[in-house]
């Protein structure tokens, strides 16, 4: 008998599943007989419980299991016979009108959409390019020096000097202070501290507080008003004005290490050669610039593909991805040490837009890959693993680590497929190259 597939919408379908009752009953009887061999009941030895008693106790459970299995098997058979590309899980409901000799169920489900990808020649992509020169290397060296800063008491002579004749606190100094804060002459939580250190100019303290500390010398005090921002994290004081008295206890000036052989050795250059150090920094910056530009252009390519593609998105797949994103959010909370993160009440609705984009993009990419043979080749995967491993001390061990886990390899395969798609689209789209600084590139990629 031919199966009738009803169209309920653009993607929603329904078919009727009919299961002969005698076939179902035979399976129920067979399972109960098998179950009876191991059933234990008071007053009977194992396997000696009368079949009728086993049936009385377990027939309902066994019938439900058999129907579930048979419905699933029959739906699979129908979907193959009708070439249905089912998206997500179907729902099964018994029909209101049942025949005497058969069970009847309605299976409602969605199918994968037809994906229409427009003319790639109309897609527009801006591709960032970055050059790494001496300026970028010098800026990186400045950052590395600041990460290794040492502080010395201002005004006290030492091997690196005394910080100058002026002993007042300046931007960049690490100061240690006592402070007392009050609102309407009443102390408040967090408003008082002793021997509190911070670096002037880093922005750790509110601007009024830093301004008050600037110019003070050890032993000096200053009283000032400070208005807490309306969005201040301490809700009890947000938007209120407090009066603070700050006492300077210690002032230390920053000493940055010289760029010499010892500095180079601290960066892993064994012989302390400064030329090698700069070459390695340049190589690392170029690798990072490549990673960032690839990430930015990938996002632009994906946006361009979505713009020129037409498709309906199965709700079932969106809902599945919403739940996946909820679980990812809970895992993230758990990694941050949030208690009971696995049960955190995160509403799936907050991920609706993100999930729809992810599913839509996945369908578009799958169509593009299939139509143009953009699958990842083993040699491409190995090349990416090798490139990733270069930034580690023992690249061979990293390669072994990757190839010892199928999930990690699958993630790399997905990355290669995306790269193939990006290269394919860039070869056909309207691409505009734009030179950007490394700093601008870093800022853009962090916002992407």
Curated annotation (Swiss-Prot):
The keyword NADP does not apply. The keyword tRNA-binding does not apply. It catalyses: [protein]-peptidylproline (omega=180) = [protein]-peptidylproline (omega=0). Keywords: Cell cycle, Cell division, Chaperone, Cytoplasm, Isomerase, Rotamase. It comes from the Bacteria. Residues 172-257 form the PPIase FKBP-type domain. Its main location: cytoplasm. One of its GO terms (biological process) is 'de novo' cotranslational protein folding. It is found in: Cytoplasm. Belongs to the FKBP-type PPIase family. Tig subfamily. Involved in protein export. Acts as a chaperone by maintaining the newly synthesized protein in an open conformation. Functions as a peptidyl-prolyl cis-trans isomerase. HAMAP family: Trigger_factor_Tig. Consists of 3 domains; the N-terminus binds the ribosome, the middle domain has PPIase activity, while the C-terminus has intrinsic chaperone activity on its own. This is Trigger factor.
């Amino acid at each position: 008998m031919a199966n009738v597939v009803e169209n309920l919408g653009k993607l929603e379908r329904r078919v009727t599943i009919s299961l002969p009752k005698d076939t179902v009953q035979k399976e129920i009887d067979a399972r109960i007989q098998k179950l009876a061999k191991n059933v234990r009941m008071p007053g009977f030895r194992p396997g000696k419980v009368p079949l009728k008693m086993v049936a009385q106790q377990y027939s309902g459970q066994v019938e439900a299991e058999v129907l579930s299995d048979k419905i699933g098997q029959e739906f699979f058979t129908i979907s193959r016979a009708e070439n249905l590309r089912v998206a997500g899980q179907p729902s099964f409901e018994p029909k209101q009108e049942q025949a005497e000799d058969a069970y009847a169920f309605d299976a409602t489900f969605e199918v994968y959409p037809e994906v229409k990808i427009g003319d790639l020649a109309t897609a527009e992509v801006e591709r960032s390019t970055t050059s790494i020169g001496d300026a970028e290397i010098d800026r990186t060296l400045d950052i590395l020096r600041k990460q290794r800063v040492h502080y010395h008491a201002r005004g006290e002579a030492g091997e690196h000097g005394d910080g100058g004749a002026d002993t007042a606190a300046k931007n960049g100094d690490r100061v240690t202070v006592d402070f007392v804060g009050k609102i309407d002459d009443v102390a408040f939580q967090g408003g008082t501290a002793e021997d509190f250190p911070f670096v002037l100019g880093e922005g750790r303290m509110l601007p009024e507080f830093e301004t008050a500390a600037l110019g003070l010398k050890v032993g000096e005090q200053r009283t000032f008003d400070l208005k807490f921002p309306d969005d201040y994290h301490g809700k009890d004081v947000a938007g209120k004005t407090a009066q603070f008295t700050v006492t300077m206890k210690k002032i230390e000036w920053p000493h940055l290490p010289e760029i010499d052989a010892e500095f180079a050795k601290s960066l892993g250059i064994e012989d302390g050669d400064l030329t090698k150090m700069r070459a390695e920094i340049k190589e690392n910056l170029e690798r990072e610039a490549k990673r960032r530009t690839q990430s930015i252009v990938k996002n632009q390519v994906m946006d361009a593909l979505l713009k020129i593609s037409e498709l309906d998105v199965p709700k079932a797949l969106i809902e599945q991805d919403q739940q996946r994103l909820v679980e990812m959010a809970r895992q993230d909370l758990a990694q941050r040490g949030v208690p009971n993160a696995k049960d955190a009440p995160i509403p799936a609705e907050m991920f609706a837009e993100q999930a729809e984009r992810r599913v839509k993009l996945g369908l578009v990419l799958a169509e593009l890959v299939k139509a143009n043979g953009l699958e990842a080749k083993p040699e491409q995967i190995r090349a990416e693993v090798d490139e990733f491993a270069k930034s580690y001390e023992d690249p061979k061990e990293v390669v072994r680590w990757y190839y010892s886990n199928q999930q990690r390899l699958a993630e790399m395969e997905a990355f290669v497929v995306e790269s193939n798609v990006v290269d394919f689209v860039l070869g056909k789209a309207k691409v505009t190259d734009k030179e950007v600084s490394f700093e601008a590139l870093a800022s853009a990629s962090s916002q992407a």
